Design a protein with these regions (language model features):
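Feature captures outer-membrane beta-barrel proteins of Gram-negative bacteria and organelles
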Residues: 141-147
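Generic secretory/membrane-interface signal
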Residues: 5, 17, 138, 156-159
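Flexible, surface-exposed loop regions and adjacent strand-edge segments
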Residues: 40-51, 56, 131-137, 169-181
């Protein structure tokens, strides 16, 4: 049976021209998501290990589940895998969004100085479908900045991404053939650079 999800929430986008030179904004999403039905979700590595410790199971075994992970059986009563029921479990984050500010100031000879800063943030969330606690990612914030000078046909800019060098992951996975081992896909750390753009 395919999982069924229920999601409701609220999104807010705001922009304020604070002064002639300064503009600020915010974008925030509040979500309340859960599995309406997910009886065949995969078990975590720990759950699978606990179930395996019960020995060979049949449909007549006195105990056929461990830690929320239940054995599945074929028509002949022998075991055919395992799964957990995640009905009602949370999906996604409680909130996420961004805050930003843009500042510009005219200079001599038609030049324009600009500076922008932004912060992206999120609540914690599970990175794997089995909701393994070891694959839970805590909430975090990332800050970016750019500043430069713009003319009619050229722009020179300095920029920094993730300037506080926040360590985050974009996903996680169980390592095959290494029971209980986990890996993570990590995102970029702090990045600094310069950019020159010229329009012909």
């Amino acid at each position: 049976m395919q999982p069924r999800q229920m999601l409701k929430g609220l999104e807010i986008d705001m922009t304020w021209q604070a002064t002639d030179n300064l503009r600020v904004g915010a974008s925030v999403a509040f979500t309340d998501g859960s599995y309406g039905s997910f009886p065949g979700a995969g078990c975590t590595a720990q759950q699978a290990s606990d179930l395996l410790a019960l020995g060979v199971l049949t449909v007549d075994s006195p105990v056929t589940s461990a830690g929320g992970c239940s054995a599945k059986f074929k028509g002949d009563g022998t075991q055919a895998g395992a799964g957990q029921d995640l009905a009602g479990a949370q999906v996604g984050t409680d909130y996420n969004g961004s805050l930003w500010a843009d500042y510009t100031r005219p200079l001599a000879s038609g030049l324009l100085w600009f500076t922008s800063v932004d912060m992206n943030f999120t609540d914690g969330y599970f990175m794997t479908g089995d909701r393994d606690p070891i694959d839970y990612h805590n909430g975090f914030e990332k800050f970016n900045i750019r500043t430069g000078v713009r003319a009619e046909n050229w722009t020179v800019m300095l920029y920094g991404k993730n300037i506080t060098d926040e360590e985050t992951a974009t996903g996680a996975y169980d390592i095959p053939l290494a029971a209980g081992s986990h890996g993570r896909y990590t995102s970029e750390g702090s990045v600094w650079g310069a950019r020159l753009t010229y329009s012909f």
